[in-house]
């Protein structure tokens, strides 16, 4: 049972529980009208201490599509924390207004702290550079709907693998399904952190690090592209030097298999050329829709409605 649970890290739920959410999401895709009033009278609180238009709108769309309502703020300046209120007091207060909370905060560990004070289910909508579990569920649903499986695949992750929290969460999640291996494509300065490599080694999961996408794209079942995130850099010169490191275009797509699935958590800058958008293997805009659907399923499960 997922009722009244929190979702802080991608590994908070076991594989069976994740599959339960994905199966419900697939039901919603097949018959959305059956779910349009299940959260009538329920209120979602969206507490976004860090701007994120897509994630916030996705949560808001999800609760509205379920017949519920939404209250919250989109930046810390709009909250009482700008007046000096502690995160603990904010969470305690909002728990009295809402039935469920989605929170994004730039400080790592803030979601764990918030969950200890929340009196309603709390969803981590992004926690510094550490975890982004609902994006992981979105990615899993996208792969499932596209490939019809979550195991026995070669998954390439490309771009900013150091600061990209979606990458870290996805690697850990896909590692729980059998016989997946990873190809990590990045410049040396943006390689995946050591703790992720140690995690993969501890699980005896095959992975390799490469610098050239074109050398490995033909081996991939899934290619997960990421942008180089300016906001994670302390030095603008480093950002400018690395931001165009990896661009996926039609020439590189010609080297890929016919059933490759290209994902991207968005927003895109220029790491995927717009000419790729019309390629049927590009599923990153479908991924946006799946993000709303999987958040609908998650809300239903945590509220115990389904």
UniProtKB/Swiss-Prot annotation:
Single GO molecular function: amino acid binding
Pathway(s) where this gene product acts: Pyrimidine metabolism; UMP biosynthesis via de novo pathway; (S)-dihydroorotate from bicarbonate: step 2/3
InterPro entries according to UniProt: Asp/Orn_carbamoyltranf_P-bd, Asp/Orn_carbamoylTrfase, Asp/Orn_carbamoylTrfase_sf, Asp_carbamoyltransf, Asp_carbamoyltransf_Asp/Orn-bd
Keywords associated with the record: Pyrimidine biosynthesis, Transferase
Binding-site residues, carbamoyl phosphate: 54-55, 104, 132, 135, 266-267
Binding-site positions, L-aspartate: 83, 165, 227
Quaternary data: Heterododecamer (2C3:3R2) of six catalytic PyrB chains organized as two trimers (C3), and six regulatory PyrI chains organized as three dimers (R2).
Family: Belongs to the aspartate/ornithine carbamoyltransferase superfamily. ATCase family.
Classification via PANTHER family: ASPARTATE CARBAMOYLTRANSFERASE (PTHR45753:SF6), ORNITHINE CARBAMOYLTRANSFERASE, MITOCHONDRIAL (PTHR45753)
Protein name: Aspartate carbamoyltransferase catalytic subunit
Taxonomic lineage from the root: Bacteria, Bacillati, Bacillota, Tissierellia, Tissierellales
